[in-house]
Design a protein with these regions (language model features):
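N-terminal low-structure segments adjacent to metalloprotease catalytic domains
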Residues: 1-37
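Short, charged/polar micro-motifs that form catalytic or ligand-binding hotspots
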Residues: 36-40, 101, 105, 125
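Auxiliary, metal-adjacent structural segments of Zn-dependent hydrolase domains
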Residues: 37-86, 147-151
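Active-site scaffold of zinc-dependent metalloenzymes
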Residues: 69-105, 118-122, 131-141
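Short alpha-helical catalytic segment bearing the HExxH-like zincin motif
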Residues: 106-115
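Metal-dependent catalytic neighborhoods of phosphoester/phosphodiester hydrolases
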Residues: 128
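Short, basic alpha-helical nucleic acid-contact segments in DNA-binding proteins
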Residues: 141-147
Length: 151
């Protein structure tokens, strides 16, 4: 029974391989990738990008919280970010180890990953946001559309 339910969530997620947007603004993504390594600056830029994406997809906004500490390790896994769907909060851990911030690119990748969970719940109305082929395809598509500059 559990296996059927798990397969259902994966197959449902895999039906959506791209995000529903033709063009996205480059400015917010650029601001995030060039905001420096301080947690306060990253929080402002991450919240601005998240607000922009929520407005673009017409979904409820979520709060971004940046923890100026090391990534937690649980059960042998390191968590760079978490999405709390019932509170609509994205948590991102700023430091790789004691007082060494992660790179801007890694920080942006974690934000897009956690935002995709929010997108799954509130735009695609999936009952569970699983790490499927479709999930990672949507992240790649979102990142490519954000990085594309208008000419």
């Amino acid at each position: 029974m559990v296996k059927k339910k798990k397969n259902y969530h994966y197959s449902k997620s895999d039906t959506h391989l791209t995000v529903d947007a033709d063009e996205l603004s480059y400015e917010e993504y650029y601001a995030l990738t060039h905001c420096g390594k301080k947690a306060e600056n990253r929080k402002k830029a991450a919240q601005a990008l998240c607000d922009y994406l929520c407005d673009k997809f017409q979904i409820t906004h979520c709060k971004v919280w940046v923890a100026d500490r090391m990534y937690p390790t649980r059960y042998g896994h390191t968590y760079m970010g978490l999405y709390w769907w019932w509170h609509k909060v994205i948590t991102i851990y700023n430091n790789m180890d004691f007082m060494t911030p992660c790179t801007n690119r890694s920080f942006a990748d974690v934000l897009l990953h956690e935002f995709m969970h929010h997108y799954d719940y509130y735009y695609l109305n999936l009952s569970d946001s699983v790490h499927s082929k479709g999930f990672y395809s949507r992240i790649r598509d979102l990142k490519a559309k954000l990085k594309k500059q208008k000419k």
